[in-house]
Amino acid sequence: MAALLMPRRNKGMRTRLGCLSHKSDSCSDFTAILPDKPNRALNYLRMYKFTATELQESRRLSTEEATRWADSFDVLLSHKYGVAAFRAFLKTEFSEENLEFWLACEEFKKTRSTAKLVSKAHRIFEEFVDVQAPREVNIDFQTREATRKNMQEPSLTCFDQAQGKVHSLMEKDSYPRFLRSKMYLDLLSQSQRRLS
């Protein structure tokens, strides 16, 4: 009964913890973050649902490209495989909602239809910003309330403040950890080995 009273956002964590305690084969959510060959960075890309074409292209990732991800967080976000590698890293920390929100906002800004804009805005708000949202992002009360007010008349800029806060949080917190992670260092190492 107590499990029913837990907030929806804890559902994913409960599933993963349940998988650990029961070692269930049906727990694909959790097995995806346990690489069978932890020394192979490309396995991370496989585990996080890259298509066969994307995997083939990722094998051509140059050392220069992967090294540039360390230049700045925005450089990482501008590179397709940088985003994929960062997403895989965030999944291992159970914090991919920040990147997913940022990406949803970027996609939202491309919306041209007014009717679609309103429905997309409400979907993003309910998924990421609202209190107890399934994938609630970590933003302060003032930002959440300002975004809530923006929902009264959604526009292409209605998430700008919240997106900026999430970007800053990832840049100051998750991004430095990613650059120090074994996963990123393995990607660099593998791309260097392919050149040799």
Curated annotation (Swiss-Prot):
Lipid bilayer topology? Peripheral membrane protein
Q: Which residues form a coiled coil?
A: none
Family matches, as Pfam families:
RGS
Q: Reply yes or no: does the keyword Iron apply.
A: no
InterPro entries, from UniProt? RGS, RGS_RGS8, RGS_sf, RGS_subdom1/3, RGS_subdomain_2
Q: Which UniProt keywords apply?
A: Cell membrane, Cell projection, GTPase activation, Membrane, Nucleus, Phosphoprotein, Signal transduction inhibitor
> Phosphoserine (modified residue): where?
S26
**An example Gene Ontology molecular-function term:** GTPase activity
**PROSITE patterns, sorted:** RGS
Gene Ontology cellular component? cytoplasmic side of plasma membrane; dendrite; neuronal cell body membrane; nucleus; perikaryon; synapse
Q: Name one GO biological process term.
A: negative regulation of signal transduction
Where can this protein be found? Cell membrane; Membrane; Perikaryon; Cell projection, Dendrite
Q: Tell me which PANTHER family the record gives.
A: REGULATOR OF G PROTEIN SIGNALING (PTHR10845), REGULATOR OF G-PROTEIN SIGNALING 8 (PTHR10845:SF147)
Q: Self-association or partners: how does it assemble?
A: Interacts with GNAO1 and GNAI3.
What this chain does, per the entry, is described as: Regulates G protein-coupled receptor signaling cascades, including signaling via muscarinic acetylcholine receptor CHRM2 and dopamine receptor DRD2. Inhibits signal transduction by increasing the GTPase activity of G protein alpha subunits, thereby driving them into their inactive GDP-bound form. Modulates the activity of potassium channels that are activated in response to DRD2 and CHRM2 signaling.
| Protein name from the UniProt record | Regulator of G-protein signaling 8
Source species of the chain: Macaca fascicularis (Crab-eating macaque)
Source organism phylogeny? Eukaryota, Metazoa, Chordata, Craniata, Vertebrata
- Report the gene name: RGS8
